[in-house]
């Protein structure tokens, strides 16, 4: 009898006071995470070689004895009357590491005459003329390429050794002039080096093309009506140059902080084009997706868990009963709060707080760690065995779930559609590989329950360098 009296006194005290709503921690929406968009750039070397090839003559020469050396063979100069022909093969580009090798084959003949003594009879000597085969040599040019911070190209070619395929011995004099000829060829090939550098530098002028892509990335894109994706580019990296399989490869990496938000089109923030640094060894992106569910839908799930449509869940206090008649849920950041009103032999308010859990397999939100707040505990736990036993708490933990499949799938599809499209001269590709919960937001009296999910995956692109 005494114990029952104590319980009634406690219940009376509970019904006489209204427990204030527990304050929720004030938090801002999740901060945008750093993400990476890698843009692969491949430049076939064959078209570059062909362009240079078209600008460099294939042949050069002078008919026999029409090229005068040291004034020609006649007195008083008493020099040499000469003639020659040089023909080259096509330029062939290859490479390895970060260097380009350009190879070219040469064939030539040489003929000259001199008066010995002077004046006197002409003595004629030659190499590579009929009946001999033309003489040959191989030329190689090595080109070092680098992309500078302003995305211009530094290109510098050097002539390698010119290797004779056979010797040029002037017969019948027996004079070997091969080495002198190779030195002369080196001087004559300097214009080819300059032409090669100019052509490669023009192919690698990436700044104008990347600037266009940078401007496009600054433009928000509408995922769904009223839902916008802003990429927010903030930096550029350059991938090291490599040459293999007759292609020069490099890449541009855009560092982004993508944001998905609701409302009107976000204001475009003009971001100056930055100098580039070295690309990071990363290829992932992460963006926070606000998945909005109407509060009425969430409320219906809570009502179902507590059987409110049928009058509410009833629990026993010995010979007394208490019934949950109303419930509300709101949230901010990493936690949610549930407000319960109950009536019966005792009236009162209780609050529970817990951390939402997102099951990626079922795409449901649940609240497995819901528990009464300290404000409620002081009033209820000492007076109501049903609360101590956790009947309502366990019911909510197991039955209160929010299906997120439809809004998540719709948002995921919208996002992947945007990540797989042409944006100016940038052809995007991307996929969402994983979703996990960051936080849940719904203020008291708010009409929308928003779950922020972190979408992680990969995004890459090709840029039109033509």
Task: Cite the ranges covered by each PLM segment.
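Bacterial N-terminal signal peptides that target proteins for export
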Residues: 1-6
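C-terminal motif of bacterial Sec signal peptides marking the signal peptidase cleavage site
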Residues: 13-16
